[in-house]
Amino acid sequence: MKEINSNILSDITVHMKYAKYIPELQRRETWEELVDRNMAMHIKKYPELEVEIRKAYSYVFTKQILPSMRSLQFAGKPIEISPNRLYNCSYLPVDSLDAFNEIMFLLLSGCGVGYSVQQHHIKKLPFIMQPFKFRTRRFVIGDSIEGWSDAVKVLIRSYLGEKRASRIVFDYTDIRPKGARLVTSGGKAPGPQPLKECLIKVEGILEAKDDGSRLTSLEVHDIICHIADAVLAGGIRRAALISLFTATDDDMISCKSGNWWETNPQRGRSNNSAVLMRHKITKEFFMDLWKRVELSGAGETGIYLNNDKDWGTNPCCEIALRPFQFCTLCEVNVSNVKDQDDLNARVKAAAFIGTLQAGYTDFHYLREIWKETTEKDALIGVSMTGIGSAAVLQMDMKAAANIVTKENARVAKLIGINSSARCTTVKPAGTTSLVLGTSSGIHAWHNDYYVRRMRVGKNEAIYDYLLAYHNDLIEDEFFRPHDTAVISIPQKAPDGSILRTESPFDTLERVKRVAEEWIQPGHRRGSNTHNVSATISLKENEWKKAGDWMWENREYYNGLSVLPYDGGTYTQAPFEDIDEAKYNKMSKVLSNVDLTKVIEAEDNTDLSGELACAGGSCEIV
């Protein structure tokens, strides 16, 4: 019974978030077709490894491991044209004008971006030089990712160039109208409006500055958040950003206080973290900042512990990145591992695929330094999800991590790239856990029995199919019954699982143990290790003790997302506890879904549905 339940959840997630539209069949891919497309891409690039590739992918077909979800989504022509689409994570300091248009390019490519607005980075930006008032230059925006990125580039340079420039007048006529088909990536064109709004808002920030002044960290941050707004509306992906700032920067610390949601809604696009240098930080300063996090009532601002002032991380904080570096991820399903041999075989297959992914570095548009830095460390991030089922905690994770580094070195040599500087990680796995039917990343299961919900538009073909064939799964959305429905699927945690009723200190100790036994053995070189991405919920009386734990154990994490505990109940919440009787009653009527019956006359895939995780918030679908 449990299998049908998690299969339904998995099939619907894959269909809505990753499957590509096949015009000649008027439907989206099945899991097998999707994985086949991904595997074919690697066989085309590495034909001499075809036998090994097919063997490793036998673990993907059976959902024991997953490759990069970006590579599943964009395998084939999109990645051949733009290999950066394969990567989950990137990081850059905003220390030159190129950063702004590169961030637009990366976000439009579906990549999560970490960026630094620390004072020592932004002070390298040029002084403002207002453009001529009455001299204008028309700029025709190209109808492509590069075209949108170049629009940001020319606008920024018209205010921050080496000499006074003409005022830019943008021409949007070449941009396809809203709803036109996107041939390469799939889905529908957003039309020019999101970009137009972004450029107007960015110009508003620049126009308000005086000649000879500098952009502040908050102004740089806001410009990037406006860029992310255009990407979100552009339908590529819920833009994922993390902004790293100097720990004494009060403007950044308080940028999400007050009624910011109304006055500066763009700031919701980014998680923000103060950078603390491990070797310099005092307990007094740490605790003072921790108190501010508690008093914010929203886990703001985040804290990022660093060993190098120029290094950074990705939005989910699980990857340690040099400036101008990418990382590609893989996932190992450890929820149902049978024994050590099974675990070892899975991590070996994941390391094999991850290393193949690290070979796609023929980037374009970006500065040459991106290719150099990415090839230097050739990072992979082999992650585990389903840790909450507790099976892997009975096994030798160090031995498994050593297999990852060994296999990475072997395959890197075969394909002519460097071995990875950092190999093992734990990502939040908000969406991949739905595909695999596991708890997410390091986190506990929600409950022994619970309902998992997903929202779907009534204009989507899958809604018509579910209504006709599986109407027990679907109901009107309480607040938007006119255009939205809710899919509800009962779920059961494996026997012996860790449940979310555990103490937050149990979660923290598990983070520490996995950091010691999985992350550190997978670290070869670099200032920072990869990280266990985790969200910790704290009740009012737990903040002081948690702050002490964070200080005492600062060697074992780079950043953790901390939120006030929310014991509230909501109508049609993404998760809802139920008892065994209700689980059995709901499960009795379930039957396997056949999504090949979902016929679509045109491509309606929505790439923005794939959540770019940010802490625990990526649990909300």
What are the language-model segments listed below?
Residues M1-V621:
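Extended catalytic cores of very large enzyme megasubunits
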